[in-house]
Amino acid sequence: MAKDQVRFLKEELADTIKEFELVEKSVYDSELAHAINTGGDVYDSLLKENALQIEDLLKKLSSKYGLKSEENPRPMMPEIKKFPLQYCLENALIPIGETDKVVEFGICVPNSLNALKNLSLMIGKKTSAKFIPPFYILQSIQQKHIHTEVDVPKSDLVKDKKEII
């Protein structure tokens, strides 16, 4: 299921790129033909060939949908009992911030906005959204958990300097 969802998201991203004309039509068509021949995705081909800048995609999505974007979000797990992680991953949402009243989610496709209202009812808090690079969401879906950064102090056993013998 995760592979199908990732493929669907990449197709949706490719359609969005075409709609916003973020790459030249000839380049898009060439990468589409290549993706069809190799069984890959247009989105991946465009990234691999450096034909697409994620920053441009985020700016276009932000301006069209009136939401902010963030290029370097910090995914996190909210302090909510029985947080609906599976629902979030199924709807391409990952939590990136939390206050007492609002949980902020990162999205990469506009269809994810439809799930925010139901999610708000599930968690009992207001929700807001920001567009983030698709990499974060695709990675979370593939590995079935939210990738968070952990601030772990270094152990006393780990030495900063290499010893010369």
Regions found by a protein language model. Give the residues of each.
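N-terminal, intrinsically disordered, highly charged
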Residues: M1-I165
